[in-house]
Amino acid sequence: MNKSVAPALSRLLRFRYSLRTFLIVATLISAWLAWAAHRARTQRSALEAIQSADGAVSFDYHESGPRTWSYPGRPPRGPQWLRNLLGPQYFDRVTFVSLPGTAVDEKWLKAVNDLPSVKWLRLWGHSGTDASLARLRKSTALLGLQLTSSKISDAGLEHLAKFPNLRWLTLNNTRVTDSGMAHLSQLGSLEELILTNTKVSDASIPAIAGLRKLQLIDLRGTQVTERGAQRIREQAPNLKVLR
């Protein structure tokens, strides 16, 4: 090969490889930007739906502990000029959602399903039903579920299997009975269970004792007897039992 041709060919090959690398990187960046824009639009729409239902949300920078939020919280991520330019939805993640005791609404159900970063979900009154739990999609991020004074029954507890990492579950003032307690065996990470003012009785002791990671259970206002509570303490000596 002519000595003058070889360097030119080498430069051409380097240019081709550099151009190919540039195109690959540009394609990846474009794909990421499109995904980020879609996620931001989805979160913005979800927030609007929740707020229109008189619901409340908190963001990741509000978290001050595993299940505590402080306001205004830590400084949100990202430089302020870029947040102003793009919008907070590109940086912030919703980690807490609370919905009031209104009837089940498809808009807010979709909104919650569109927020995969939610760690704690609170459904009050009519917003917490067997049907609403059935329509919530599977989430490995959800750690806490509060269903205070909701319409949840034994049938609804079957859907808790969709939340395998659930650590805190509140079922006080619900329709839950002994028949539904067996469904809790699917929650191997459960640490705290609030059953106050339900119809749970001593018949649920085997199901409760089977929750190996459980650290606290509140049985006040239930049909569990003092003898039954003592049996739980004997079978699970590290479990704090409130009765």
Language model region names:
Residues 40-55:
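Alpha-helical transmembrane signal-anchor/signal-peptide segments
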Residues 20-35:
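Hydrophobic membrane-insertion alpha-helices, especially the h-region
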Residues 1-13:
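N-terminal Lys/Arg-rich, disordered targeting/topogenic segments
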Residues 107-108, 129-132, 153-156, 177-180, ...:
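The leucine-rich repeat
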Residues 89-95, 114-120, 137-144, 161-168, ...:
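Leucine-rich repeat
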Residues 52-155, 167-168:
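LRR N-terminal entry segment and analogous cap-like coil->beta motifs
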Residues 109-112, 133-136, 157-160, 181-184, ...:
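Hydrophobic anchor residues at the C-terminal helix/turn of individual leucine-rich repeat
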